[in-house]
């Protein structure tokens, strides 16, 4: 007899992955624009540092990731940082700190689906608060919903819409949610105009999550980190599984990547230029975005049909049908290298 699986795994949604390049390999070179990745290799210094760290992988990594957290302080200021296996790992640990069976978690949707999936895994009741028609956050509705909730998730720039919630709006939320912990997902903030770091010194119920998968190009190394209130750190470390941060190879590469300002600025300049060029060249309506991707309304076509058609032509993009509240007509495309972007423009305009 098979042991009983938890009901949320039987009935709830799982995370839907974007298409991988192997799904269209037979077409030749692939334009991989489905996963909001950096199209360029990481910093040469990061590659060298990661390779050098392989010599000591017989030893466990520093559980506090001291070298990396000190590098983060040099870049961001003297805050308290934790490091995790992608931001996903940090999200799960934060939820273990606060959530018990039946506790409420609030999510501003449509957004990154893992918030709700991870919260359900902790036994939470997940309340999705729909964004407005322009996909900006309904601040009053979101703030009201947070009353009595344990944790709330807000992504800015938002995945998959690219829309932003300004620091002033985030402050309004924080001023109105009492002791609810707000997890502010800043995965794409390097491509945006606003800076949310000044909020960290003002609120004891704010966590700001960030990643090195995007502008730093370390997606395959799974380096996430977060600014957390100092009071939370000992509880976070208790909730984390042993050595649940990142590998010593990933940590060494991350420290070197943080120091390579030229690589970061070169990537940003490319992304900002091509984000506008792609937006203006596509014949379908494109939402304003401050991320490294664009969301496009392909109606009257369905998102799945457009994604399948482009995949057959060697261009991989993401259907947004799996994001609750988005319907069947939106696709998301990452900003790639020049060749990838030109291929996408050519093929989407043939639809």
From Swiss-Prot:
This is Histidinol-phosphate aminotransferase. Pathway: Amino-acid biosynthesis; L-histidine biosynthesis; L-histidine from 5-phospho-alpha-D-ribose 1-diphosphate: step 7/9. The modification N6-(pyridoxal phosphate)lysine is found at residue 214. It is an enzyme of class 2 (transferase). Its EC number is 2.6.1.9. The keyword Disulfide bond does not apply. Keywords: Amino-acid biosynthesis, Aminotransferase, Histidine biosynthesis, Pyridoxal phosphate, Transferase. It catalyses: L-histidinol phosphate + 2-oxoglutarate = 3-(imidazol-4-yl)-2-oxopropyl phosphate + L-glutamate. InterPro entries: Aminotransferase_I/II_large (IPR004839), HisP_aminotrans (IPR005861), HistidinolP_aminotransfase (IPR050106), PyrdxlP-dep_Trfase (IPR015424), PyrdxlP-dep_Trfase_major (IPR015421), PyrdxlP-dep_Trfase_small (IPR015422). Belongs to the class-II pyridoxal-phosphate-dependent aminotransferase family. Histidinol-phosphate aminotransferase subfamily. GO terms for biological process: L-histidine biosynthetic process. It comes from Methanosphaerula palustris (strain ATCC BAA-1556 / DSM 19958 / E1-9c). Its cofactor is pyridoxal 5'-phosphate. One of its GO terms (molecular function) is pyridoxal phosphate binding.
């Amino acid at each position: 007899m098979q042991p009983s699986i938890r009901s949320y795994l039987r009935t709830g949604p799982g995370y839907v992955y974007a298409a991988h390049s192997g799904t269209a390999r037979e077409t030749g070179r692939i334009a991989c624009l489905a996963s909001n990745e950096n199209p360029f290799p990481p910093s040469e210094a990061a590659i060298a540092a990661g390779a050098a760290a392989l010599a000591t992988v017989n030893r466990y990594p520093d559980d506090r990731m001291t070298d990396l957290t000190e590098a983060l302080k040099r870049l961001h200021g003297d805050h308290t940082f934790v490091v995790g296996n992608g931001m996903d790992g940090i999200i799960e640990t934060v939820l273990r700190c606060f959530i018990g069976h039946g506790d409420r978690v609030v999510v501003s949707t449509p957004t990154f689906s893992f918030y709700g999936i991870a919260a359900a895994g902790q036994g939470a009741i997940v309340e999705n608060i729909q964004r407005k028609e322009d996909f900006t956050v309904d601040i009053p509705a979101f703030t009201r919903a947070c009353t009595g909730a344990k944790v709330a998730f807000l992504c800015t720039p938002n995945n998959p819409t690219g829309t932003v919630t300004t620091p002033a709006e985030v402050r309004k939320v924080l001023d109105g949610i009492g002791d609810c912990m707000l997890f502010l997902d800043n995965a794409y903030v390097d491509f945006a105009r606003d800076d949310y770091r000044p909020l960290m010194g003002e609120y004891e119920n704010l966590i700001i999550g960030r990643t090195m998968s995007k502008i730093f190009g370390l997606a395959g190394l799974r380096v996430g980190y977060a600014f957390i209130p100092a009071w939370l750190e000992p509880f976070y470390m208790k909730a984390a599984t042993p050595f649940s941060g990142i590998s010593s190879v990933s940590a060494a590469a991350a420290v070197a990547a943080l120091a390579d300002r030229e690589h970061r600025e070169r990537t940003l300049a490319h992304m900002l230029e091509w984000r506008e060029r792609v937006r203006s060249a596509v014949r379908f309506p494109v939402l304003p975005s401050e991320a490294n991707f664009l969301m496009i309304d392909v109606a009257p076509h369905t998102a799945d049909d457009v994604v399948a058609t482009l995949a057959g032509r060697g261009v991989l993009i993401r259907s947004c049908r799996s994001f609750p509240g988005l319907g069947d007509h939106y696709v998301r495309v990452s900003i790639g290298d020049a060749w990838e972007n030109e291929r996408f423009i050519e093929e989407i305009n043939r639809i």
